[in-house]
């Protein structure tokens, strides 16, 4: 329950800080030899099934497909991986023990106190970051490293030092702040040549109109691809593993109408026409794009 509480607080803080006004293919690399591939897969399954994850987190695997997603991105347990804005740590709880077991390294880019608009919110961001780090003090998570990402942050890590950079359901937050291109530029600089950028994001159908600040939480796939191309990335493929054809991406409270947030009308609010919470529970979690980009080899 602690993790869930921290997650909710971080989202609330992000709203206050103006970070998130509304919230929370085949590669060219040769296949690993069977004797090395199998233990890596087993170790990932072990991390996914581990008691470091809460039952509530595991219940979302059916929507978030962590094994298939990480396999698609081609992440290996001996790599240096950066997770950008880990939020409540849903993916961190899988990545940290898995990379620890394989001799890899996980770097977490958390909220940036320097981007907070005032001293009070800066202090609150610092406190949240300390609470987040305290959650990962258990040696089972390995030795984690920390950096920050924001509209004003410097390099994520030493240039050209990361094998993979991952971010899950965050692009809309950076669009809201107007610094989405900076994310792709910073990721490009941090990756080794041949390194992978893996993005999962709520998908707005191409027929829908893209709000530049993504106030619904949904984003056009073509826009994400353009941001990556602008930064120098090659598009390497996409997967439909996190798709949900039942999601029309057109809901009264945007993506937050759906689980896991399942936003409800406020006490003094007149519910939207035909409001039926059961309908949104039945849809499930959002339709998501899963995109893989590569930093070209030099």
Residue ranges and their predicted role:
Residues 273-298:
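C-terminal lobe and adjacent flexible extensions of AdoMet/dcAdoMet transferase-like proteins
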Residues 77-87:
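Conserved class I S-adenosyl-L-methionine
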């Amino acid at each position: 329950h602690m993790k869930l509480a921290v997650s909710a607080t971080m989202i609330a803080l992000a709203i206050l800080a103006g970070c998130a006004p509304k919230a929370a293919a085949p590669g060219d690399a040769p296949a690993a030899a069977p004797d090395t591939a199998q233990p890596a897969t087993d170790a990932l399954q072990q991390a996914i099934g581990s008691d470091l994850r809460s039952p509530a987190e595991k219940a979302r695997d059916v929507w978030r497909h962590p094994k298939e997603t990480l396999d698609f991105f081609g992440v290996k347990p001996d790599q240096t991986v950066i997770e950008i804005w880990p939020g409540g740590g849903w993916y961190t709880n899988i990545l940290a023990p898995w990379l620890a077991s394989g001799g890899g390294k996980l770097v977490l880019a958390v909220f940036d106190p320097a981007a907070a608009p005032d001293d009070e919110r800066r202090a609150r961001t610092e406190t949240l970051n300390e609470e987040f780090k305290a959650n990962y003090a258990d040696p089972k998570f390995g030795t984690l490293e920390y950096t920050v990402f924001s509209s004003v942050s410097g390099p994520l890590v030493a240039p050209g030092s990361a094998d993979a950079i991952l971010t899950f359901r965050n692009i809309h937050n950076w669009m809201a702040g107007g610094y989405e291109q900076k994310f792709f530029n910073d990721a490009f600089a941090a990756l080794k040549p041949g390194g992978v950028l893996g993005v999962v994001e709520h998908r707005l159908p191409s027929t829908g109109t893209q709000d530049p600040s993504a106030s619904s939480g949904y984003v056009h796939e073509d826009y994400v691809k353009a941001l990556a191309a602008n930064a120098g990335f090659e598009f390497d493929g996409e997967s439909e593993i996190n798709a949900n054809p039942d999601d029309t991406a057109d809901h009264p409270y945007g993506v937050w109408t759906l689980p896991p947030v399942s936003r409800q009308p406020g006490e003094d609010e007149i519910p939207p026409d035909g409001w039926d919470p059961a309908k949104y529970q039945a849809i499930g979690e959002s339709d998501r794009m899963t995109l893989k980009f590569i930093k070209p080899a030099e």
